[in-house]
A protein has these predicted regions:
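Class I SAM-dependent methyltransferase SAM/SAH-binding core
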Residues: 45-104
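Helix-to-beta-strand junctions that scaffold the AdoMet/dcAdoMet cofactor pocket
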Residues: 64, 124-125, 138-139
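A short SAM/SAH-binding and catalytic strip from SAM-dependent methyltransferases
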Residues: 114-126
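A short glycine-rich, Lys/Arg-flanked "PGG" loop and its adjoining helix->strand segment in the class I
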Residues: 128-140
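Conserved beta-strand signature within the Rossmann-like core of class I S-adenosyl-L-methionine
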Residues: 141-149
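Conserved alpha-helix/loop element of class I SAM-dependent methyltransferases that forms part
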Residues: 25-44
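Core SAM-dependent methyltransferase catalytic element
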Residues: 183-195
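A short acidic, Gly/Pro-enriched loop at the edge of an enzyme's catalytic core
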Residues: 103-114
């Protein structure tokens, strides 16, 4: 099921650039919290699907100085914004960003230790296919994390945490667990699973 939300779903042009700046500020707590649960370590390889303006990638690169991070997003506008934000890490060879889709990730099997997506599953054309791709590119014993707003209204209600946990289990992830941030003013859930 795809939820089309206009500019937030695929930011483009000047308006998309502005939307990206707003998303960067608004999603900062989501990024920080998800990365704290995922705990990307030095020397690990991580992938973010739907990186938007690139804030989570930057935070991860800053927190683990020898990690390698890749990102895929389907918005050329967000790719440009994320490249600008992560320019130093790209020049160091620690970050690699590309235009693409969760439906066909441009990476080899078992390429990453950790994979994550924050507030993006709402825009996936086929969540089961996307989760299968995440499982394909994460190594055995690796972890996948999907963070969503823990809200019971559209469009967020389509991917409630229990639904996400079921979808991850059906995609072949094990030890699937739901974490909630416990912040009533900004409720989030992160579903973690192991390959």
């Amino acid at each position: 099921m795809t939820t089309h939300l206009g500019q937030p779903g695929r930011p483009r042009g000047l308006v998309g650039w502005i939307v990206g700046r707003i998303m960067r500020r608004h999603n900062r707590p989501d990024n920080v919290w998800t990365l704290s649960l995922l705990a990307i370590g030095d020397g690990e390889r991580a992938l973010e699907v739907g990186f938007g303006p690139g804030d989570a990638i930057r935070l991860a690169a800053e927190a683990a100085p020898s990690c390698r991070i890749a990102g895929v997003d389907h918005s050329a506008t967000m790719l440009a914004a994320a490249r600008q934000l992560n320019r130093v890490f790209i020049e160091q060879g620690r970050v690699r960003l590309s235009l693409g889709s969760v439906d066909a990730l441009p990476f080899a099997d078992d390429a990453f230790d950790k994979v994550f997506s924050i507030n993006c599953i709402y825009f996936w054309r086929d969540p089961a296919l996307g989760l299968g791709e995440l499982r394909r590119v994460v190594r055995s014993g690796g972890i996948a994390a999907l963070t969503v707003r823990d809200i019971e209204r559209a469009p967020y209600d389509a991917y409630r945490p229990d639904t996400l946990a079921r979808l991850m289990t059906e995609a072949g992830f094990a030890s699937v667990v739901i974490h909630r941030n416990g912040v009533p003013s900004h409720p989030l859930a992160c579903v973690l699973g192991t390959k």
